[in-house]
């Protein structure tokens, strides 16, 4: 039987790169907290954008897709799903909304985990929503020649309820240890959840929801304003490689959590860095959208396109970005390079 024991996080023998990552994240978290108090409206707008990106990306990782227009309608207007994929997306929307609105009262307990899974599966009409798997499952991979092979055998269905009970208790025990850094603990728990693979379907999406839940409960809420799931999707090859490395030997209690911890923390760090970019202005100035566009271009060491600026500042409309860039070109503070789609802007 797999044993869940996180006491190794309390022995002081942690890789230096992980310790440095947690320190860097903590510093960015403090800065974000100060900004959130001062710029409430900007954070509200960023949250609305990130929610759409999170729902789109987490489902896309699993091959569940629809058009951007339909994603926005489902998320922002509660539009009724038109097909099976959209039903899956609507379920994820509801589960994510529940976490955003009520994370303080949702915990890493079996009852809450099952309820979130049921919510996520509700629109798709699966009868197994909110229930652990009843049949064993395997995780397959396909090689370059098209041959399938078993990459990982998760916990058997018969042992899953007991394993989830032990996982819950191990987490609650480690959470109460003041000497264990919660940023290191959370990815360990998420890895174990993925290796148990407790549900017939939806384990990957549930792991991302639970990641956000535990991060929010510990005050690390960058994923509310810069999509955590989108960062995973953008670098999913690294994510799956870290998962592969950390799950090797898991059944025999011989795995190393460190590759997955590093990937998880790197993803969170990227969220905080992206959030920091969106406030790239001189401290003390009123942060208007115009000022943020100007600072983004003026502080960049490389030429930026309008699309790149819009990605850095998703709450600022393309029309506003274009107007500010035009004014900056006229005043001579920036110069335009190239033409058409190849147009870039750089400090003059």
Model-inferred region functions:
Residues 1-348:
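FIC/Doc superfamily catalytic core
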């Amino acid at each position: 039987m797999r044993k869940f024991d996180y006491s190794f996080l309390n022995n002081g023998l942690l890789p230096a790169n992980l310790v440095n990552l947690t320190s860097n994240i903590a510093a960015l978290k403090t800065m974000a907290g100060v900004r959130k108090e001062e710029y409430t409206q900007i954070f509200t707008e960023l949250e609305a954008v990130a929610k759409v990106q999170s729902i789109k990306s987490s489902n896309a990782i699993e091959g569940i897709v629809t058009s951007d227009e339909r994603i926005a309608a489902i998320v922002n207007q509660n539009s009724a799903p038109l097909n099976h994929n959209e039903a899956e997306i609507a379920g994820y929307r509801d589960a994510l909304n529940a976490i955003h609105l009520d994370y303080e009262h949702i915990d890493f307990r079996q009852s809450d985990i099952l309820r979130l899974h049921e919510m996520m599966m509700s629109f798709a009409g699966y009868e197994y929503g909110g229930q652990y798997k009843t049949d064993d499952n395997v995780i397959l991979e396909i090689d370059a020649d098209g041959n399938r092979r078993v990459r990982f055998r998760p916990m058997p269905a018969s042992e899953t309820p007991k394993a989830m009970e032990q996982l819950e208790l191990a987490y609650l025990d480690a959470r109460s240890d003041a000497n264990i850094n919660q940023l290191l603990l959370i990815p360990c728990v998420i890895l174990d959840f993925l290796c148990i693979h407790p549900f017939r379907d939806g384990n990957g999406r549930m792991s991302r929801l639970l990641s956000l839940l535990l991060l929010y409960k510990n005050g690390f809420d960058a994923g509310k304003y810069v999509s955590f799931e989108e960062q995973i999707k953008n670098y999913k090859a690294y994510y799956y490689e870290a998962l592969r490395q950390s799950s090797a030997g898991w059944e025999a209690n011989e795995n190393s959590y460190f590759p997955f911890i590093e990937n998880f923390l790197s993803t969170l760090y990227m969220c905080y860095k992206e959030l920091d970019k969106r406030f790239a202005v001189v401290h003390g100035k009123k942060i208007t959208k115009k000022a943020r566009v100007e600072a983004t271009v003026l502080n960049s060491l490389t030429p930026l396109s309008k699309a790149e600026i819009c990605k850095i500042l998703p709450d600022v409309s393309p029309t506003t970005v274009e107007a500010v860039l035009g004014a900056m070109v006229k005043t001579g503070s920036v110069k335009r390079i190239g033409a058409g789609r190849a147009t870039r802007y750089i400090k003059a």
